[in-house]
Structure formats: C-alpha cells, structure tokens
Amino acid sequence: MQEMMDAEEKVLYNHLECVKQEAQLITVEGEIITRLEHAMSEGESYDMKEYLNTAEEIAEQKLKMYTALLEDVKRFKTKYASKL
C-alpha cells in the first residue's frame, strides 16, 4: 500500500512540475509572439530565424515534458489497475 501511495505522489508531483513549467513556457511564448507581431505590424525588422528556433525549442520541451508525464501515468495505471 505504501508503494502505491509513493507512486501516486510521484505522478502528482510530476504533473505539478509540468503545469509550473508550462506556465513559464506560455509566458515566454506570449512574449516572443507579441514582439514578432509588433515588429511585423510596425514594419520593423525582426529575426524570424530566432523566433522559429525559440518556438521549436519550446515545442520540444513541452513534448518531452508531457511524454514523460504520460509514460508515468500509463505506468501507474498498468501497475495498479486492479486497485483503481
């Protein structure tokens, strides 16, 4: 029973960390999108390559983060299916 409780806490902690990291990434995304939109609408120069690289890095971070969370959830459900 203690093992299952520890596993529950681990899944919950990992999910919470994903939510925190997602919030930070959303802030960064909002900033880069706003800067690019402003530059485009004002006819100012902008670095599309930098924007694309940042967007790619953020997307990869999110995929990695949520893939790990999904694996944790599936592992938990498989291991404790009879107790859920």
Give the residues covered by each predicted segment.
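Extended, charged coiled-coil stalks and adjacent low-complexity, Ser/Thr- and Lys/Glu/Arg/Asp-rich tails
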Residues: 1-84
